[in-house]
Amino acid sequence: MEEKRHGGAGRVIVVILILAVLLAAGAFFLFGGRVRVETPSFSTGYRYDRAKDYATLDTFPVEGVTADKVELHWISGRVEIRAAETISVSENFAGDDAQRLRWRLDGDTLIVQPCASGAQELPEKTLTVTLPQTVLLKVDTVSADCALTGVQTAQLDVDSVSGALRGDAAVTEMLSVDTVSGGASLDLTAAPKKVTGNTVSGVMELVFDEAPGTVKLSSTSGSFALGLPAGAAYQLDWSTVSGDCDASGYQAPEGRGAKKIKLTADTVSGG
């Protein structure tokens, strides 16, 4: 069944409850193009590529480093990211050297790993990062929660297995959130041109202070809640066998929106 719905003025919470087969998995998008992904392996501890190129904070502090992109990898614990005038990286851990974070510069990209390559039995740690608004951001976590405070960036890409994503951010170009069972609750204070949200069983709530460009969502058994600004018009392309969509609260003349926001949700089956 394919269905198209249109809405108009008023503050809206569009709640999409989906039970489906995940249509897209394993894709990584960063900064609008193909990305070099340093995928870790857990078969013999946490391992990643080019391990010899990484340094500890004791050897080479990050303070004073400039980068156009920041890529954060973290396993468990918490990741806190705040807006600032300069880049800084720290962790609340002073234990075994192999379990301390590593970092390196790859051209204009700063990459942070949670430990030495090959380390095992990693403790829960808190990673704290500050970023200026010109920096593009990529975050990969396993079970670590991620908190954003006043982050300003053109592109934000977050991938998590079971960690939660919370906070506020001003994203102007691209927002991508992918989880397995982790939840996300974001207050978006700018208007990103492109938004994608994918989850297997997580709950995502995205509240926009300004109308975004396009929003595309997909899920297996998770749910989505979208908050759009007062007066925003939208067009929802809803393709499903038996999914549910609640767009109560929207009223539009003759049931038509102005296509200012395009929302797309694809499912196979649901209840």
Give residue ranges: language-model regions:
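Short linear S-[DN]-x-LW-Φ motif typified by the pepsin-like aspartic protease active-site region
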Residues: 28-113, 126-138, 145-151, 155-157, ...
